[in-house]
């Protein structure tokens, strides 16, 4: 391992092994590398292979990729499964445990590289423990929303009290979901203990991927939950890059009227059920808007796309040229910034919500799992979208409701006000982003000075 960058303070970054965590860590790494920090970016080999091309091409002198090998004591986790991507859900906590068991290998990396600071993620307080063994300061970075993180922490430290920003029935439902999550275990440790330790071990402050422009009330609630200062780092959006494969999509978009297309995507790690797929398809047709649908099926899924979609759906959209279905990866940031896009039908993963906000695209929320319902509240709080309501009894998604909300956000008179608000938020987030990053750099340099 190359350790020759002694003229700059160095940060070893260790994200959780999921796309939604690795990508924001990498964007933060790029920004810090431009502020005279040398970055060691540490992950499993297959994650580095997936994310590393852009780094090696454009940041090879300032961001160094460091492989962390997980122990081979987990036969169900071969190298291709040392990431959450395409990992069967029942193996997630096997992966959490295997990651923790890599602590000795991580200690060897620390001993060799001797970084100035360590930045770690919510799932691995053990990384902070390892850092302190070598007298290295460690900082928690949360690539999640402030609403999700504050609600999580509230349920750990104040479980019997009302969370001040949710209605009682909503809090009751989401608290049940989050308490189930908090009581899952890996290596005999409950999630709630793992997460609390992650907060407690962070040195002086905690970084979080958000902006005061959109989540000020949730950020201001943190001091009542923990001793550390919470510092927003801004949106951390990856700059769109051009690939030849994008041409077909961009050409199709360019044929459409301004703000006439809905972009539909439900993330890279959640896969809608066949029933949800049918209702989304029905809603898109009933809304009569143009649309691009980034369509993904789980790799273990036996169905084809044609079998997953309603009968005749693909033929109908091809005939009327209303829609395009794209399987697999799509240039999401590039699509969202295109002038033809008038709405974003999204699962409300935090990365997608922030991208929609930065590019000023109104959001039609279809939250499906995890913290997505809480993220959707940020969209509504800021007046830049709506959530598709589900059946109150069985939580089923309905195509008619999908169509109604799409029309409201994209086509009807109210859409003008939503678009105006989306544009205002976009401009404000861009303006405040540099100031927020300046605070991050200042805080890190304070830690560097103390470590000298």
UniProtKB/Swiss-Prot annotation:
EC top class named in words: transferase
GO molecular function: flavanone 7-O-glucoside 2''-O-beta-L-rhamnosyltransferase activity; UDP-glycosyltransferase activity
Tissue specificity remark: Expressed in young fruits and leaves.
Listed transmembrane segments: 136-156
Residue sites binding UDP-beta-L-rhamnose per the record: 268, 330, 347, 351-352, 355
Catalysed reaction equations from the record: flavanone 7-O-beta-D-glucoside + UDP-beta-L-rhamnose = flavanone 7-O-[alpha-L-rhamnosyl-(1->2)-beta-D-glucoside] + UDP + H(+)
Induction note: Inhibited by 10 uM UDP.
Keyword Membrane: yes
GO biological process entries: carbohydrate derivative biosynthetic process
Coiled coil: 407-436
Function: Involved in the production of the bitter neohesperidosides in citrus. Shows a strict specificity for UDP-rhamnose as donor.
Protein known as: Flavanone 7-O-glucoside 2''-O-beta-L-rhamnosyltransferase
